[in-house]
């Protein structure tokens, strides 16, 4: 059986000022692995005094066609119910790709990610 490293990752999330969590989109939503990880990590955080409260969190979704906004929204729901602060960008934090390297062809998606990075860095600096 594989070693469960959830507690290790939760501790890293606990000490981080912010987190950027993303998922590829499979069958219209985040992957099962991402969903399982997030449900477990955020349950632990909530059960331990809302340990992610007031941290900065950004969601990113990579899709081929549909489901990016569903994935984006599901991650943001976890941030918001955990009392986290979510920075915005110039568009939804999604990027379109089918295979490795394809993201470079989504110019709007790349611009959105750059803006998100700048906005997240600005917010972290202001809160720090």
Model region roles, listed by residue range:
Residues 1-85, 90-91:
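Helix-loop-strand module that forms the ligand-binding subsite of alpha/beta enzymes
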Residues 2-8, 15, 81, 85-128:
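Glycine-rich phosphate/pyrophosphate-binding loop and the adjoining helix
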């Amino acid at each position: 059986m594989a070693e469960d490293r959830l507690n290790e990752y939760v501790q890293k999330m606990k000490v981080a000022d912010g987190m950027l969590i993303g998922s590829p989109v499979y069958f219209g939503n985040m992957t099962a692995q991402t969903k399982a990880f997030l449900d477990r990590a955020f349950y632990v955080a909530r059960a331990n005094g809302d340990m992610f409260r007031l941290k900065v969190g950004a969601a990113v979704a990579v899709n081929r066609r549909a489901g990016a906004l569903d994935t984006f929204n599901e991650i943001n729901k976890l941030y918001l119910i955990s009392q986290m602060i979510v920075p915005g960008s110039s568009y939804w934090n999604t990027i379109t790709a089918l295979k490795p390297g394809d993201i470079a062809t989504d110019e709007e998606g790349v611009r959105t990610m750059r803006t998100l990075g700048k906005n997240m860095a600005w917010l972290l600096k202001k809160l720090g």
